Amino acid sequence: MTITVNTNVSAMTAQRYLNKATGELNTSMERLSSGNKINSAKDDAAGLQISNRLTAQSRGLDVAMRNANDGISIAQTAEGAMNESTSILQRMRDLALQSANGTNSASERQALDEESTALQDELNRIAETTSFGGRKLLNGSFGEASFQIGASSGEAIIMGLTSIRADDFRMGGQSFLAEQGKDKDWGVPAGARDLKFEFTTQAGELVTLDVLAKDGDDIEELATYINGQTDKLKASVDQDGKLQIFAAEPNLQGDLAISGGLATELGLNGGPGVKTTVQDIDITSVGGSQNAVGVLDAALRYVDSQRAELGAKQNRLSHSINNLANIQENVEASNSRIKDTDFAKETTQMTKAQILQQAGTSILAQAKQLPNSAMSLLQ
């Protein structure tokens, strides 16, 4: 073994290994104290990029779940108000049926109409005051809203809310009134029993209804027979014996064409009907009460269709939240395997580094004494 003074190779080697052990110890302590296996790009450049992408995805999924829950909250708020509106419409229908009874006096019908009018006002109040986060939901101003339910752009669903005010055109339809009233002794003529209705629905479907009335039926029996042939139209008779036809708004686009021998007999002509909504109903007369039932039935169907759509949206959002939670769980698990510290493994590494550091320190101290042996040769 060569003994030198200017260059202590043994000390240099011991120093190098001591520095390595110290660096490994510092890295282990950093990982254990932070809980992260990757604390800078030098630890794992590729792993850091993947981890950051997974973190962004996970945070996006978390926000998406909050957005979906907001959507459910809006739908629940609107649906709750619609539920109360349905109860109001049901009560108004009861009042209309009660008023249509022939035993009622004019004053009794007036009292029933006053309650019906008060319920109309409450229906409008609910529509105008139901809100979520400052946005009105049921007065027609909400329109459509997009709910971001994914971690990336474009992953959204659209939810729309429409007006349920008593004067909204969808809360009713069109009314048609025959010109000729018929008394109890009138019967359907044998040679004029045919009645034909033609109209186009809002969906663009051309509908033709052919009704062949029974010979000798009176005007009330005729209305009952028409109602039994179709649910597209509602027939009733007013106090003057005039046949009334009501078509709900979703079932009618444009004019209603009415033809046939019976149409001529009754003076029932098609054409622009009278726009009739819940706001317009008047149950102070038998005819108005009868027609009001058809209007309210149309309004109930409209509100029910809106509630059904909201229910479907709620179910969709609930399933979306469940799916997002499952995706987030798997993304977090993947990110954990890449980024998080394995404490069992890292503790072992730290113990190893501590032992090597202590050994390196001891060996370096001994290596520094080697040049001193040259002095003994000079004595």
Swiss-Prot record:
Lineage, top-rank taxon, reads Bacteria
Cellular component, GO annotation: bacterial-type flagellum; extracellular region
User: What keywords appear on the UniProt entry?
Assistant: Bacterial flagellum, Coiled coil, Secreted, Virulence
Keyword Coiled coil among record annotations: yes
Q: Where in the cell is it found?
A: Secreted; Bacterial flagellum
Q: Which GO terms describe its molecular function?
A: structural molecule activity
Q: Which residues form a coiled coil?
A: 103-128, 302-341
**Keyword Coiled coil among UniProt keywords:** yes
Question: What InterPro entries does this protein map onto?
Answer: Flagellin, Flagellin_C, Flagellin_C_sub2, Flagellin_hook_IN_motif, Flagellin_N
| Its job | Flagellin is the subunit protein which polymerizes to form the filaments of bacterial flagella. FlaA is essential for flagellar synthesis and full motility. Important for virulence at two different levels: is needed for crossing the fish integument and may play a role once the bacterium has entered the host.
PANTHER family according to UniProt: FLAGELLIN
Q: Which NCBIfam families match?
A: PRK08869.1-1 (NF006466), PRK08869.1-3 (NF006468)
**The name this protein goes by in its record:** Flagellin A
What organism is the protein native to?
A: Vibrio anguillarum (Listonella anguillarum)
Which gene codes for it? flaA
